[in-house]
């Protein structure tokens, strides 16, 4: 319950892979929900599923997103802050023709006169071997891991493992520069 503003209904799940069929089942059964909150810290949800929820005026996110949603006074769709930051940077980049959110972490970027790139955006404080391996297991298809958290770092071991998997790894600032090159 909000201290100030409209009341809202939340549906809570705990899934690592959030399928559109599951979400449609929830939305069809509980027609008055405003947000679906996933307890799992690491999860995957497709861009198609996110778009479906937004078409129904339903927000989706983790527990932090639920807290942010509850501090609003209305039930407007909440876009996760990290993707809002990423999309603004990509929209403003002169080499980016367009981009598509494939899921909650991966973005397919179409560039002018250069090959498309699929990047996974990680907001981890430190990108470790585990970050690389778990991302590869969960998200499978991508060419580069982009560290969007300006704090912390990327371990040398993570760079080695990423290299053996033919995955590049860099910070957000370095990635924006790489978008101008033929690197992939």
Label for each model-derived stretch:
Residues 1-29, 35-40, 105-138, 144-145:
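Conserved catalytic cores of phosphodiester-cleaving nucleases, focusing on short active-site segments
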Residues 26, 45-56, 155-165:
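Short, aromatic/basic amphipathic alpha-helical patches
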Residues 41-44, 151-153:
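Gly/Ser/Thr-rich loops at beta-strand to alpha-helix junctions
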Residues 47-94:
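Surface-exposed beta-loop interaction hotspot
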Residues 66-71, 127, 175-180:
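A short acidic, often aromatic-flanked loop/helix-cap motif at beta-alpha or helix-coil junctions
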Residues 71-74, 108-109, 181-182:
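Short, solvent-exposed polar/charged micro-motifs at secondary-structure junctions
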Residues 132-184:
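Alpha-helical oligomerization segments
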């Amino acid at each position: 319950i909000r201290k100030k503003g409209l009341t809202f209904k939340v549906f809570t799940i705990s899934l690592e892979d959030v399928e559109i069929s599951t979400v449609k089942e929830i939305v069809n059964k509980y027609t008055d929900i405003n947000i679906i909150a996933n307890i799992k810290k690491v999860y995957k949800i497709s861009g198609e599923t996110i778009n479906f929820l937004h078409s129904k005026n339903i927000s989706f996110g983790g527990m932090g997103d639920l807290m942010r949603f509850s501090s609003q006074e209305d039930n407007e769709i909440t876009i996760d802050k990290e993707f809002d930051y990423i999309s603004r940077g990509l929209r403003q980049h002169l080499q980016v023709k367009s981009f598509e959110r494939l899921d909650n972490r991966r973005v397919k970027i179409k560039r002018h006169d250069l090959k498309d790139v699929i990047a996974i955006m990680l907001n981890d404080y430190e990108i470790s071997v585990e970050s690389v391996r778990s991302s590869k297991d969960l998200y499978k298809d991508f060419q580069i891991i982009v560290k969007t958290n300006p704090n912390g770092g990327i371990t040398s071991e993570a760079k080695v493992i990423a290299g053996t998997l033919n995955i590049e790894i860099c910070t957000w600032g370095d990635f924006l520069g790489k978008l101008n090159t033929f690197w992939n």
